[in-house]
Each structure stands twice: as structure tokens, then as C-alpha cells.
């Protein structure tokens, strides 16, 4: 994958997250902000999830209260380089824990 393809795929990921949060109709307040390639999800309790892109490695990084995760694109899924879990699974787990209710992105 070249840099422009990586950015296109990361932009698509960011857009999907933003669209899902715009459609969020849960009880807790969840906000999303994109600034300079970093996506920040803020929760009502003050906690945050930070998602950023690591262009030199062509990875997406996810920082949550539970820890940090690095994802490589394998096929059409972003996969954690340590656990083998998908980006969406880990994001949904973290967002649900931090929101105090189930949050789905897919």
C-alpha cells in the first residue's frame, strides 16, 4: 500500500466513525472531533478515545482507557498487531465501556 492509498483508507475509517456518531441516539452524550488526522471521541464522563494514523508504518492507532492498540490492514479489515482482534471490535468494546452503554459502529 502506498501513502495515498493509506490516507484514503484512513479517511474512510474516520468518515464511518463520524457518521455513526452523528446517528447516535443513545442516552449518553458522545462527541467526535477530527483535527490534523487525529480523531477524538469524547464521552459525557470526560473520558476520551484517540484514533490516529501512523503514516510511516501505514497503521491506525487506537488509544482507550483499556490501553493502546496498533492496527495493520489485512485484506479489508484493520487487525490489531498483538491480539488479532478487529479495529471495530476493540473500538466498540472501549466505546461501550466508556459510554456506559452499548455503542455499535457497524
From Swiss-Prot:
The keyword Metal-binding applies. This is Iron-sulfur cluster assembly protein CyaY. One of its GO terms (cellular component) is cytosol. One of its GO terms (biological process) is iron-sulfur cluster assembly. Involved in iron-sulfur (Fe-S) cluster assembly. May act as a regulator of Fe-S biogenesis. GO terms for molecular function: ferric iron binding; ferrous iron binding. Belongs to the frataxin family. PROSITE patterns: FRATAXIN_1 (PS01344), FRATAXIN_2 (PS50810). Keywords: Iron, Metal-binding. It comes from Klebsiella pneumoniae subsp. pneumoniae (strain ATCC 700721 / MGH 78578). The gene is cyaY. HAMAP family: CyaY. InterPro entries: CyaY, Frataxin/CyaY, Frataxin/CyaY_sf, Frataxin_CS.
Amino acid at each position: 500500500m502506498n501513502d495515498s492509498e493509506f490516507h484514503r483508507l484512513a479517511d474512510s475509517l474516520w468518515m464511518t466513525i463520524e457518521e455513526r456518531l452523528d446517528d447516535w441516539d443513545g442516552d449518553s452524550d458522545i462527541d467526535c472531533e477530527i483535527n490534523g488526522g487525529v480523531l477524538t471521541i469524547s464521552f459525557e464522563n470526560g473520558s476520551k478515545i484517540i484514533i490516529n494514523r501512523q503514516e510511516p508504518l501505514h497503521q491506525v492507532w487506537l488509544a482507550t482507557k483499556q490501553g493502546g492498540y496498533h492496527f495493520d490492514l489485512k485484506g479489508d479489515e484493520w487487525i490489531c498487531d498483538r491480539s488479532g482482534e478487529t479495529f471495530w471490535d476493540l473500538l466498540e468494546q472501549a466505546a461501550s465501556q466508556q459510554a456506559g452503554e452499548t455503542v455499535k459502529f457497524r
